[in-house]
Amino acid sequence: MRHRKKGKKIGRTASHRKRTLQSLSNALIENKSITTTVAKAKALRPFVEPLITRAKEDTQHNRREVFRHLQSNDAIDELFGEVSERVGDRPGGYTRIIKLGQRSGDGAELALIELVDYNDVPPADTGQGGSGGTRRGSGKGRRTSTEEEQADASSSGDSSDEESESVEEDEATAEEASADAEQGEAEEEEESEEDNT
């Protein structure tokens, strides 16, 4: 019977799987986010979250239990020091998995797994398609058609100012170029007069 055998196999033997999850956990704790395959990210989440929960209470017993899984003093110090302070008031759900698409070499589905409390900066709006928010957005921050028209009108006004500035700059450079050309012609005439005399 397969009782108490929770977890994904991820195509590895038990010892290989244990070391893979250990290595991924150490990297996640030390770097706060890692890029890996979706299957490994999904297997890593239930492995690392109980360790983070144990790290909230810094006792010798908890340190030994976590060390049993991680086998890295640097990761233990980071987990019980900085990470446990950040997640102290969070009741669970310390990690987030974001799918990134396929890897170009073998087509494997990639994912970014990160510690939630370390992603304070929201992603910058690139202005390229999409709603600009999360997929689970409730639609509260979306623009109405009148707001979009006002934004378009203000941006077209800005572009006309930019166009007039660029026209003025072009005229100034044209005047400088013509002045340089006249000066060059005057110098050539002086040289030709000197040659004639």
Swiss-Prot record:
Keyword Ribosomal protein among record annotations:
yes
Looking at the record's lineage, which domain of life comes first? Bacteria
Stretch list, region Disordered:
120-197
**SUPFAM superfamilies, sorted:** Prokaryotic ribosomal protein L17 (SSF64263)
Q: Name one Pfam family in it.
A: Ribosomal_L17
Assembly and partners are described as: Part of the 50S ribosomal subunit. Contacts protein L32.
PANTHER family recorded: LARGE RIBOSOMAL SUBUNIT PROTEIN BL17M, RIBOSOMAL PROTEIN L17
Full protein name = Large ribosomal subunit protein bL17
Please tell me the species this chain comes from: Salinibacter ruber (strain DSM 13855 / M31)
Which gene is transcribed and translated to give this protein?
A: rplQ
